[in-house]
Regions:
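Conserved SAM/SAH-binding beta-strand->alpha-helix loop
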Residues: 109
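Core SAM-dependent methyltransferase catalytic element
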Residues: 210-240
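S-adenosyl-L-methionine
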Residues: 113-144
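Conserved beta-strand signature within the Rossmann-like core of class I S-adenosyl-L-methionine
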Residues: 179-186
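A short glycine-rich, Lys/Arg-flanked "PGG" loop and its adjoining helix->strand segment in the class I
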Residues: 166-178
Length: 240
C-alpha cells in the first residue's frame, strides 16, 4: 500500500476509457512477484522517480494495516482499495477474510501495478485514476455483484487540491452501499479532508485508530454519508 503520501493526482489529460488496464480476462500464468526486487526497494525506486506522486519513503506497516482493517463494517465482504502500492493492505484484507475475487485494487503507478497484478492474480487489479473509479469498477465487472461495503484508501489526499479530493470521494461513494465507509490514513494531525468540504458533499468523519509504530506514525479516519444522504442513497438503490 502506498503510504499516506501516495498521491494519485493525474497530471495531464484525464485518462480515456481505453487507458484502464485490467487483469481480467488475461492474467499472468504464474506468480512471479517474489522473484523480482525486494518490495521496499521497488517502492523506494518509484519514490525516487516521482517523490510528489509517492510522498513516502517506505510502504505502510502491518500495524497500520490492522488499524485500517479494524474499521471495516461488520461482515464486510466486498472492498475496493485505492492506491494498492506494494500490497500491504491487500494482503491484510485477504488475511481478514475478504475473498480476492471480491477485492478491487486500483493503482496508478505502472511498476507497482505490475507487482500487484503478479502477486494477486485472483483479485481485480486495475491501473487507473481514482477519480474514474465508477467507470473503472463498472467496466471491470466488479459492480455486477452490487456496490462495495468499504473503500480503503492509501491515497495522499492531504497533498491534493480540494477539487481533486471532492472528485475522489464522490467517485468512491458512488461505488459504495448507502452505509458504506471510506477508510483513509494520514500522517497529519487532523483529517486530510476539511470539514467544510465534507459538509459540501454530504459526508461525516470520525477518527479511528492510531498506528504508533508505523514509520512515520499515522492516524486513521472513517468517512460516511450524512444520515440524509444515506437515506437518499437507500431509496435510489431500491429504485434501481
Amino acid at each position: 500500500m502506498l503510504a499516506a503520501g501516495a498521491l494519485r493526482h493525474y497530471h495531464g489529460r484525464r485518462p480515456a476509457f481505453s487507458d484502464f488496464r485490467m487483469t481480467q480476462p488475461t492474467r499472468p500464468e504464474k506468480n512471479n512477484f517474489d522473484s523480482g526486487p525486494p518490495v521496499a526497494w521497488t517502492f523506494f525506486r518509484q519514490w525516487l522517480k516521482n517523490p510528489l506522486a509517492i510522498a513516502a519513503l517506505s510502504p505502510s506497516g502491518r500495524q497500520l494495516a490492522r488499524q485500517m482493517i479494524a474499521e471495516l463494517p461488520h461482515e464486510a465482504q466486498r472492498v475496493i482499495e485505492l492506491g494498492g502500492g506494494t500490497g500491504v493492505f491487500t494482503r491484510a484484507l485477504i488475511g481478514h477474510g475478504i475473498a480476492a475475487k471480491d477485492l478491487l485494487v486500483l493503482e496508478l503507478n505502472e511498476a507497482l501495478y505490475q507487482h500487484l497484478r503478479a502477486r494477486f492474480v485472483d483479485a481485480h487489479v486495475v491501473c487507473g485514476d481514482a477519480r474514474e473509479l465508477k467507470a473503472i469498477a463498472t467496466a471491470d465487472g466488479f459492480l455486477d455483484q452490487g456496490p462495495a461495503d468499504a473503500v480503503i484508501s492509501g491515497l495522499g489526499l492531504l497533498s491534493m487540491t480540494k477539487r481533486t479530493q471532492a472528485e475522489i470521494l464522490q467517485a468512491a461513494f458512488s461505488t459504495l452501499k448507502p452505509e458504506g465507509r471510506f477508510i483513509q490514513f494520514t500522517y497529519g494531525p487532523k483529517s486530510p479532508v476539511s470539514r467544510e468540504l465534507l459538509a459540501e458533499i454530504g459526508l461525516s468523519v470520525r477518527r479511528g485508530g492510531f498506528a504508533w509504530w508505523n514509520m512515520p506514525p499515522a492516524s486513521v479516519y472513517v468517512y460516511t454519508r450524512n444520515r440524509s444522504r444515506a437515506v437518499h442513497a437507500v431509496r435510489t438503490e431500491s429504485k434501481g
